[in-house]
């Protein structure tokens, strides 16, 4: 589902790990932008008609044979272009300059000395002063193309910032998009607002109105189904669609018996009772738990749950007449990953999604969130009036509690983990910590230990508490609870949950660990 935007920045991705940060910074300015891999850059120009272009960094060396290039047309269409790191080098090489392998590499914090005034530095950096930046390069520009001048230098990069103001071409060897370049966002604002003249009119309010109009045009009078889990993405999709097409929407909640305590009831209460959305609740717990019986391999558990979800969802859909469209909560990072500039990434875990549904069910897709990042989805949810209880929820995996029970999943273990998890989250909320934490949950270990309760000996399970801070889930640190909180939470779990006699806290960061245990 494509929505038109009057002011657009095109970001050409050469495979940098921080390309998405560029997009997030630009969108935070109220300007719409899209990332396209370098192979599709020309198609992106024709489709988006951008008012500015940014060239990303890259793990490649511009000196190597076959390394990525930008289409020459990018420099000839008359819009401002900003090259970042590899983007600077590729701009120079393609326009007649020279890049060499550096004898002095720069990785991490560095200092740039401003040599000349420039529109890029206007109101931020002064000529003759030094400023902290973040570098990550081995090669460096050795000779400038005709028309360029040097505006900033560093110890390892004699052309750390360059400009050809006549053609509105700018480039920097450092990364302005990362927080380690303190003034980086201001420099990007200069490029987007002052140099490119973009106004910053893009907002979630305008996106909501455009999305509703686009949905109505695409769907017409047809019926749409939507898988609803109660998570942020599916909740926002459901409410947005309902606002657009009303009773043409039917939502299906597949209850696989692996949800948290009272979760299904909360979803039904909000969407069926409050929003009056037609919602079919499928209690499929027996189907899922019987299929998972005795299975200990985490990958097989995920695949079994994914396969059964599709089968149950498909069976329910057959009972609804006239369905032509399937709504999905695909987000922009999913879209970016699917057309990666450097190919598919290594599979760490199978992701639980309904991506296999359209092919099997012969339906058209409606993906109203496919242009948004996660934080933007939450903002859209607020525009739609969704309660914070749903919008502020921690991420919850599609396979549910099955991957928080290492080893075989049983009904007894699920009841134990539900109760322990509810207590843990309750204590987090009471302490006012919920919004400080990216994700928090209990893992029930397939280990039993000896304990003493009263005058009796116990032999019960160990549970691990997990809590992490993160920005995007790609990296994470454990949350530094104080001992009083951990002591109080552990005491409640042991005293109130039958089946647990020992509590531990997981202090592993990501990497090397993952956030979930399976």
Swiss-Prot record:
It comes from the Bacteria. Gene3D superfamilies: 3.30.300.10, 3.40.50.880, HUPs. ATP binds at residues 229-235. The active site is at 85 (nucleophile), 175, 177. One of its GO terms (cellular component) is cytosol. Pfam families: GATase, GMP_synt_C, NAD_synthase. Homodimer. This is GMP synthase [glutamine-hydrolyzing]. It comes from Bartonella quintana (strain Toulouse) (Rochalimaea quintana). The lineage of its organism: Bacteria, Pseudomonadati, Pseudomonadota, Alphaproteobacteria, Hyphomicrobiales. The gene is guaA.
